[in-house]
Amino acid sequence: MSELSYLEKLLDGVEVEWKTLGSIAELKRGTSITKKDVIDGTIPVVASGRTPAYYHNTSNRDGQTIVIAGSGAYAGFVSWWEEPIFVSDAFTVKPHNILLPRYCYHFLMNMQQQLHEFKSGGGVPHVYPRDVSPILIPIPCPDTPEKSLAIQSEIVRILDKFTALT
């Protein structure tokens, strides 16, 4: 059973309002940096791949961070970071207060194939914030923020456990 099927089952019977990602999260591009500009350090530089491109001495994002690769073969690849990082050839999704970051991450991970299909461009494919901004995200109990966050938290707990098993 796919993660979306699980998410749909977990939301079954709950009032849900679908909102565009762009209306409930900040989509922010990274800062361009080349290997020659990097000052050797321990901060992962997250660019267009599945692993850090290199390591730098400063970060431009802290805490729980959702990153979507912006170009190349892995454009659209979603990753999760819980440490300071330097986002380069990618963009981040920072949910507003009505959406838990990890809930948003699970939803985007479920859409991984669709995100890859957003690629456009000639030689080097790209995925842009404008491509993912219209994605609809289910917000449970939208009129009761505390209940909404509690439901999201429980869904995250279950999906984290499910993901750890697969």
Regions found by a protein language model. Name each.
Residues 1-166:
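Charged, alpha-helix-forming regions
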